[in-house]
C-alpha cells in the first residue's frame, strides 16, 4: 500500500514493476483508488487555498494551463492495470497492450503544497525513468501532465518540461486529463496511466478541455486544447507529483 499523496498511483505501478523485475512477483494489479469528497478533505484543501472557487461554472472550473485557473477540482474514482513479465503474459496466452519501459521517483521536500519553481525534483524523477528505459527525452512523443489547475503547480511542471525538452517543447503534445476528471489525488496516477496507455495503443492524444486562454508564461506549448488528436505515439510519459515534494514519472511504450 503506497501512501505518497498525489503520486501514489504512479508509485504503486512503479513498485509493482520493480517487484516483477526482481522476481518477487510474476503479475500484479496496480494503480490507485480514492473516495475523498467529504467535508474534512474539502475543508482541508480549502484551507490550503488549493481548490477552485469557480462555483458558478463548475463544469469549467478545472482548467489546467489556462490563465484563469484558480485551483483544482476534487474527483473520485479508481484506475488499475495488470502488469506482468512478458514471459508470464505469453505463458497464459495474454496479448500485451503496452510495455512499461521506464519509472523514476524523487523527493524534493521544497514545500508542503508545491514543488520548487525550477522543477528540479520532478526533473530528477523523469530523468530516472528515461535512464531505466534507456531512452532520451527526444524519444518521448506525448506527455500526460500532472497539471492540476493550480497557479503555482502548473508553472512548476512547465519548468520541468522545459528542463527535459528544451526548444522541442512545442513539438510534444501535452495533455492534462484532469481537466475532464478533476484531481483524483491518490488515484490520479492510476487513471492517468490508463489514459497514457490508450494514447500509446491507439495513437490518439486526449485533449485538455476548458483551455480558452493559454497562460502567457506557457507560450510555445501544445496542450491539445478542446479535442482529441490523432498522433503517432511510440513512447509516452505520465507525470505524478504530490504534496510534500514527492515526484514520479512513468514511461509507457509500444510493445517491441
Predicted regions located by residue number:
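Conserved small-residue
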Residues: 9, 16, 45, 82, ...
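Condensing-enzyme catalytic core mediating Claisen C-C bond formation in acyl metabolism
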Residues: 56-133, 142
Amino acid at each position: 500500500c503506497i501512501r505518497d499523496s498525489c503520486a501514489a498511483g504512479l508509485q504503486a505501478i512503479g513498485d509493482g514493476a520493480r517487484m516483477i523485475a526482481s522476481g518477487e512477483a510474476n503479475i500484479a494489479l496496480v494503480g490507485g483508488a480514492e473516495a475523498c469528497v467529504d467535508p474534512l478533505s474539502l475543508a482541508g484543501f480549502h484551507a490550503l487555498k488549493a481548490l477552485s472557487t469557480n462555483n458558478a461554472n463548475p463544469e469549467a472550473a478545472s482548467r489546467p494551463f489556462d490563465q484563469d485557473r484558480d485551483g483544482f477540482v476534487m474527483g473520485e474514482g479508481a484506475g488499475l492495470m495488470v502488469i506482468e513479465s512478458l514471459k508470464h503474459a505469453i505463458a497464459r496466452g495474454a496479448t500485451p497492450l503496452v510495455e512499461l519501459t521506464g519509472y523514476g521517483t524523487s523527493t524534493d521536500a521544497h514545500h508542503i503544497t508545491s514543488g520548487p519553481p525550477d522543477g528540479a525534483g520532478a526533473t530528477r524523477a523523469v530523468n530516472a525513468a528515461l535512464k531505466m528505459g534507456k531512452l532520451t527525452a527526444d524519444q518521448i512523443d506525448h506527455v500526460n501532465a500532472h497539471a492540476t489547475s493550480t497557479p503555482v503547480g502548473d508553472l512548476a511542471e512547465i519548468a520541468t518540461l522545459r528542463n527535459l525538452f528544451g526548444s522541442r517543447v512545442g513539438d510534444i503534445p501535452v495533455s492534462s486529463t484532469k481537466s475532464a476528471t478533476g484531481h483524483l489525488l491518490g488515484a490520479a496516477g492510476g487513471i492517468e496511466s490508463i489514459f497514457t496507455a490508450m494514447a500509446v495503443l491507439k495513437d490518439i492524444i486526449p485533449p485538455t478541455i476548458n483551455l480558452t486562454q493559454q497562460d502567457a508564461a506557457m507560450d510555445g506549448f501544445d496542450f491539445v486544447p478542446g479535442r482529441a488528436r490523432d498522433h503517432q505515439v511510440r513512447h509516452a510519459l505520465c507525470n505524478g507529483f504530490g504534496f510534500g515534494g514527492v515526484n514520479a514519472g512513468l514511461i509507457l511504450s509500444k510493445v517491441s
